[in-house]
């Protein structure tokens, strides 16, 4: 069966594919996440005793770009390139037996250093807004410069213009003092250096993770890793490295996050599927008075909480969204208290949660009307001149734009109509010749977002023509598991089931609008 045959079969039975996807969430409850260069590099340095060390080193070699860097274009490549280069230098310094020749390691590290030197010495480097980047970059630059000094190299790497090591030094002193630190910092505990080893500020979760991060967990376990093979954190790390044969994701588990997004994408599109009762029960139980985290080891956040609430309301088991008040500020809703910056996608999802609950519980709608009005106004103020939105939790403006546009289309009222129309026009104007959409190149994920916006909010012939071209592109991309990571964490990542759900939602919407789809009986 050809790739196109597979794609057509999936398109013709999106409902069955959605059902299989939902059931698959139960069999992999920690979530399905792509491996991360940054996180894998940290395990190479911090945990050479962990199963799969050689495989991790080989994976770093194999994923190096032709220019010597790692990761996505633009400033997104800095953190993974720093991590991978430092990891290879650590392997060379220790003389690890990894199955990769020393000359191969030296050449890869040298290419990484040359790229980093060029990148960091230039004034035009623009860094993305990603968690802990202001701590991660200085910590890795310090480690690399220690390697260079040991090797007698007199030209150290510099920090990007405008970045200082002072915040990192303050956090390290904070961790060493054993004073309580914000839970979100535990996700990047590895930046604390020696102070992370056994840090009293960290608490091991029931599943053995520190901060839902393999790197943070390995840093905390420290020198106990090889001597205590039965330690819960060691067991947790061993379980994670087996998922990808050595490399590791940047964050795990993402149980609530994954389930909320998958269920809401599918339900919003109207795909018929059944949810295991225990999954709905778990999702309801996860939402406490202060909200819910994406997974064990993370702090509660408004994004995961609102999407879970929205999914529950769509699926007929609404829960009062009062836990979201914990994230309200005078102007908008924060991802978590103390957030530096703000997120349009988070506020769009909060609007979804309030709006959908008010729709299914109209007797309580007045309670949430002021917040809905505030959210609408805040989102409208942040639309860019071209009609799009951008966001701190995703590299693609198509994700931010579909999040804001759909929330405003459903719950923003007449005042939001011009903004949604402008977003539709932006999507129409940015379609590629092959029918796809994408920030750097066309992807199934971003095309699915664009299609959903067009099919929910558009209607005229020009919209139908563009949507038909986008749908045809999706049919040609049979394996949606392939594609670049676009979601923001310490490194870019790809939540596979979430992306799959978004694509299935777009396919189903295209089918329901009869965009040139053959009847199921003919496929």
Regions found by a protein language model. Give the residues of each.
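Edge strands and adjacent loops of beta-rich recognition modules
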Residues: 187-201
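Buried hydrophobic core positions in alpha-solenoid tandem helical repeats
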Residues: 21-22, 60, 112, 116, ...
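An alpha-helical repeat/solenoid feature that recognizes helix-turn-helix modules
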Residues: 1-12, 28-55, 72-98, 118-187, ...
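A short helix->beta-strand "capping" segment at the edge of beta-propeller domains
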Residues: 13-25, 199-202
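A short, surface-exposed, charged and often Trp/Pro-enriched helix-loop connector in the C-terminal portion
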Residues: 107-108, 473, 520
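Helix-turn-helix repeat elements of alpha-solenoid scaffolds
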Residues: 14-19, 192-195, 327
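Nucleic acid-processing catalytic cores of prokaryotic defense/repair systems
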Residues: 65-70
């Amino acid at each position: 069966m050809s790739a196109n045959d597979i794609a057509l079969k999936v398109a013709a039975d999106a409902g069955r594919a959605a059902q299989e996807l939902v059931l698959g969430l139960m069999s992999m409850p920690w979530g399905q996440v792509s491996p991360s260069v940054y996180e894998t590099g940290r395990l190479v340095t911090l945990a050479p005793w962990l199963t799969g060390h050689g495989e991790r080193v080989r994976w770093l070699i194999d994923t190096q770009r032709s220019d010597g860097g790692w990761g996505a274009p633009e400033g997104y490549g800095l953190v993974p390139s720093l991590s991978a280069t430092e990891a290879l230098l650590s392997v060379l310094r220790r003389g690890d037996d990894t199955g990769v020749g020393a000359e191969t390691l030296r050449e890869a590290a040298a290419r990484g250093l040359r790229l980093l030197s060029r990148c960091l010495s230039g004034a035009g480097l623009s860094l993305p807004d990603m968690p802990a980047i202001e701590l991660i970059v200085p910590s890795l630059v310090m480690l690399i410069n220690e390697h260079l000094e040991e090797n007698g190299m007199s030209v150290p790497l510099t920090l990007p213009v405008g970045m200082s090591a002072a915040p990192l030094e303050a956090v390290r002193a904070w961790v060493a003092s054993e004073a309580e630190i914000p839970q979100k910092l535990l996700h990047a505990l590895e930046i604390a250096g020696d102070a992370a080893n056994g840090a009293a500020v960290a608490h091991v979760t029931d599943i053995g993770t520190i901060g839902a991060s393999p790197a943070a967990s390995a840093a905390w376990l420290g020198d106990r890793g090889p001597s205590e093979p039965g330690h819960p954190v060691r067991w947790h790390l061993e379980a994670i490295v087996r998922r990808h044969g050595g490399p590791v994701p940047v964050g795990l588990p993402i149980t609530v996050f994954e389930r909320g997004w998958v269920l809401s994408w599918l339900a919003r599109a109207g795909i018929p599927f059944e949810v295991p009762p225990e999954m709905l029960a778990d999702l309801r139980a996860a939402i406490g008075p202060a909200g819910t985290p994406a997974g064990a080891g993370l702090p509660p956040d408004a994004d995961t909480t609102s999407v879970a609430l929205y999914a529950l309301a769509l699926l007929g088991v609404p829960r009062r969204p009062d836990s979201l008040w914990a994230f309200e500020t005078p102007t908008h809703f924060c991802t978590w208290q103390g957030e530096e910056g703000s997120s349009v996608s988070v506020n769009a999802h909060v609007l979804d949660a309030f709006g959908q609950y008010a729709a299914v519980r109209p007797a309580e709608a007045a309670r949430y009307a002021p917040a809905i009005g505030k959210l609408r106004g805040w989102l409208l103020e942040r639309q860019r001149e071209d009609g799009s939105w951008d966001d701190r939790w995703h590299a693609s403006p198509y994700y931010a734009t579909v999040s804001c546009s759909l929330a405003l289309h459903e719950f923003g009222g007449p005042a939001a109509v011009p903004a949604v129309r402008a977003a539709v026009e932006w999507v129409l104007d940015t379609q590629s010749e092959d029918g796809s959409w994408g920030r750097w190149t066309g992807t199934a994920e971003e095309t699915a977002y664009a299609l959903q916006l067009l099919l929910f909010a558009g209607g005229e012939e020009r919209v139908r023509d563009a949507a038909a071209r986008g749908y045809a592109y999706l049919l040609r991309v049979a394996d949606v598991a392939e594609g670049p990571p676009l979601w923001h964490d310490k490194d870019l990542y790809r939540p596979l089931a979430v992306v799959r759900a978004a694509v299935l939602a777009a396919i189903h919407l295209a089918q329901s609008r009869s965009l040139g789809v053959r009847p199921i009986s003919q496929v």
